[in-house]
Amino acid sequence: MKHIAIKENHLYSKAYAKGQKFVSRNTVVYVLKDLKSEKLMRANPMKEYVNRIGLTVSKKLGGAVVRNRVKRILREGLRQTENEMNLKKGYLIVIVARASIVDASSIHIKKELTKAFTSLRMIEQ
């Protein structure tokens, strides 16, 4: 499923300040209930709740090529995790890349995201 990107800076700040956090070797995952999800559900043609996803990759990690590769790896790990697990809908999810992610593969990221979402109770039964 195509994600709705978080574009407003205040939503990132809110997720950092009030969201639940899971720290792992390559990523930090923040999760916060999205208050605008009701409005987005009505606008969505399929009339279901959606998660809004934000990826944060610092310039400290490297040049544009490296940062874009890291974002592709994060998106792929998230896609694989969502295909395997039934994530709860209606949340803001912010994934922050750490320095060690440059050498990681999407398989490692998928394992970390699975562990993070399980720990944050984001899996629907």
Model-assigned labels for residue ranges:
Residues 1-125:
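Positively charged, solvent-exposed patches that mediate nucleic-acid binding
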